[in-house]
């Protein structure tokens, strides 16, 4: 939005604000300062005005410094409408974080200004787009007294985080009861030494890796496509169809006789996910102004290219196991499903606290690790 402004244009954003507790406004200030610094502006505070009334603050940002005439008009309107001016080029904020963030003249200074023990006020990026999650994981281990100053916004974040942790626990319990217990009751199949362990590792890798690609990309493309519903629909459609196509094409691969596929396929997936990791950002920037249909087609092409070989892994793994015994196949189905369910929740947590790129790196690691059990299982 800032890039689209004329030199004398104005961007206005309003968020919740509380003078007694830190809130989303602090992160908004951090984002505005980062945007101004990226434009080569050395004094962000001269390009920003922050006003508030009751529990809402409004930030005004301009590519050019506010003139005396602009500031006179803002002060007159603020007095008439009973707004409090929290920051302007004429008046520094009394709140340390707001004051220091707008006084930063480098990214390093901004990072230092936004440090907090429990809250994350760093500017949200495309790789970490969770603007409203301002709680650090360290806050989960803190006492209520330590968190008392953080206010209702952080309190809501804390409740949401506990809900995510509860979801992880329920997913683990559900997977154990529905998949784990029946498999344990069926007994461990008799297999040559190391085959069963390699099988568990193989299907755990593809179950985890698949979800570590799917879940983060839904979030990454939500803004690009304009709505989370579009991202979910397009991502699920493209990945499921492409993975199904890959599963069908896997019949043409003689993995039992040609051991090279156990190396070539995982490496191909690693390269394609790495391409998404490196190129999705530049592609989004270059095509963000295209129509919705064009953007959907770009996402489908980008995702399907990696999903086709990803879809080959499951049927090829089953075929590798049939060389030893059909009795172990239910175990492999179960492990794949269990890790997929757990990884879908874990991917959200990783993306929130470490970034979408970290989730993709986990996926890359899973498919790279896949080489080990695949080679061991290939006769």
Q: Where do the language-model regions lie?
A:
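Alpha-helical transmembrane segments of multi-pass membrane proteins
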Residues: 1-379
């Amino acid at each position: 939005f800032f890039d689209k402004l004329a030199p004398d244009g104005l961007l206005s954003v309003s968020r919740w604000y509380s003078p007694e507790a830190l809130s989303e406004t602090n992160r908004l200030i951090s984002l505005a300062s980062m945007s101004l610094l990226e434009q080569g502006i050395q004094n962000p505070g001269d390009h920003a005005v922050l006003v508030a009334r009751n529990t809402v603050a409004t930030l005004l940002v301009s590519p050019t410094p506010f003139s005396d005439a602009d500031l006179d008009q803002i002060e007159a309107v603020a007095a008439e409408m009973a707004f409090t001016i929290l920051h302007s080029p004429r008046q520094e904020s009394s709140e340390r974080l707001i004051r220091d963030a707008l006084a930063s003249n480098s990214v390093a200074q901004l990072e230092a200004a936004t440090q907090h023990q429990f809250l994350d006020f760093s500017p949200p990026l495309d790789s970490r787009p969770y603007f409203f999650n301002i709680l650090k994981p360290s806050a989960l281990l803190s006492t209520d007294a330590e968190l008392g100053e953080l206010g209702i916004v952080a309190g809501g974040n804390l409740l949401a985080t506990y809900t995510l942790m509860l979801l992880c626990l329920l997913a683990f319990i559900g997977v154990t009861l529905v998949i784990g217990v029946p498999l344990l009751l069926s007994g461990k199949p008799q297999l040559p030494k190391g085959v069963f362990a390699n099988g568990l590792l193989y299907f755990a890798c593809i179950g985890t890796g698949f979800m570590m690609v799917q879940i983060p990309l839904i979030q990454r493309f939500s803004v690009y496509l304009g709505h989370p519903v579009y991202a979910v629909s397009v991502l699920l459609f493209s990945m499921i169809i492409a993975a199904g196509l890959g599963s069908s094409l896997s019949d043409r691969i003689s993995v039992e006789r040609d051991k090279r596929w156990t190396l070539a396929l995982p490496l191909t997936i690693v390269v394609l996910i790495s391409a998404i990791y490196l190129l999705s950002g530049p592609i989004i920037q270059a095509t963000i102004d295209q129509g919705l249909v064009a953007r959907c087609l770009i996402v489908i092409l980008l995702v399907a290219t990696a999903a086709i070989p990803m879809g080959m892994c499951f049927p090829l793994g089953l075929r590798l196991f049939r060389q030893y015994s059909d009795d172990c196949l239910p175990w492999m189905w179960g492990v794949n499903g269990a890790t997929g369910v757990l990884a879908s929740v874990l991917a959200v947590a990783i993306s929130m606290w470490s970034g979408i790129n970290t989730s993709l790196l986990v996926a890359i690691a899973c498919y790279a690790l896949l080489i080990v059990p695949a080679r061991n299982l290939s006769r």
